[in-house]
Amino acid sequence: MLAGRPDRAPNAAPMPTTLQIAAACLFDERGRLLLVRKRNTRFFMLPGGKREPGEDALSALQRELLEELELQLQAGALQPLGQFQAPAANEADTWVQADIFHAALPHAVQPAAELEELRWLDTSLPVPDDLAPLLRDQVLPALKRLPSV
């Protein structure tokens, strides 16, 4: 079982749709975590997105970072954090299964493609209430368990 998703009871209703995504915890030189908000949405989340059919998580993440932030990161710069599941922030009756990576952000970035806003999060401060469930309930606790990122 993946972190975050309850086991299904034998006679329970069918499970909701699950999207396969890849996302990155990108840290600036001050140790702050980069968050993004897509157009016409409320919740902040990690940069990344849906995997295309047949696409591995790392390739999907590199493609999404280029599209969303015009950021090119080599595969070796992205370290795996883990695989997590949570309710999707912006799609009803949907879960996300996410491969999460972390890396240092090599330079400043600007929102592109469908991104509306960027925000920096100091992970030592209280968690804001406008974070996606995956980030709030799964990724932030996992980051706190790392020796250092």
Can you name each region flagged by the protein language model?
Residues 1-14:
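N-terminal amphipathic/basic-hydrophobic helices that include classical n-h-c signal peptides
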Residues 11-33, 50:
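Conserved N-terminal beta-strand and adjoining loop/helix that marks the start
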Residues 26-27, 35, 102-103, 120:
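Conserved hydrophobic "DFG−1" position in protein kinase catalytic cores
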Residues 32-68, 72:
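Conserved Nudix-box catalytic region and its N-terminal flanking loop in Nudix hydrolases
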Residues 72-82:
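A short coil-to-beta-strand element that immediately follows conserved catalytic motifs
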Residues 84-110:
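Active-site-adjacent beta-strand/loop module that shapes the phosphate/pyrophosphate-binding cleft
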Residues 100-102, 110-147:
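NUDIX/MutT-family hydrolases
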